UniProtKB/Swiss-Prot annotation:
DNA damage as UniProt keyword: no
Gene Ontology CC terms, in alphabetical order: cytosolic small ribosomal subunit
Protein name from the UniProt record: Small ribosomal subunit protein uS17
HAMAP family xrefs: Ribosomal_uS17_B
UniProt source species: Buchnera aphidicola subsp. Acyrthosiphon kondoi
One record GO biological process: translation
A Pfam family per the record: Ribosomal_S17
PANTHER family (UniProt xref): 40S RIBOSOMAL PROTEIN S11 FAMILY MEMBER, SMALL RIBOSOMAL SUBUNIT PROTEIN US17M
Similarity comment: Belongs to the universal ribosomal protein uS17 family.
Primary role: One of the primary rRNA binding proteins, it binds specifically to the 5'-end of 16S ribosomal RNA.
UniProt gene name: rpsQ
Length: 84
């Protein structure tokens, strides 16, 4: 049996912690009754070893073993730097 490593892309919304960032993942879901597509946001705590991310950056993350109570994702790469 092969395990697939889950990877996601999202936007950095906070980088105030040391070696950690908060990434918001947006997805669209269909409303069960009305059928309208709605945006839903999930916030994930991500391990950033080198503190290389800033707010607004688009990043790629992957799932890993639990690193703390809330962190079980790690940074793969910065896809797009935010223009500030």
């Amino acid at each position: 049996m092969t395990d697939v490593i889950r990877t996601l892309q999202g936007r950095v919304v906070s980088h105030k912690m040391e070696k950690s960032i908060v990434v918001a993942i947006e997805r669209t879901v269909k409303h069960p009754i009305y059928g309208k597509f709605i945006k839903r946001t999930t916030k994930l705590h991500v391990h950033d070893e080198n503190n290389e991310c800033g707010i607004g950056d688009v990043v790629e993350i992957r799932e890993c073993r639990p690193l703390s109570k809330t962190k079980s994702w790690t940074l793969v790469r910065v896809v797009d730097k935010a223009i500030l």
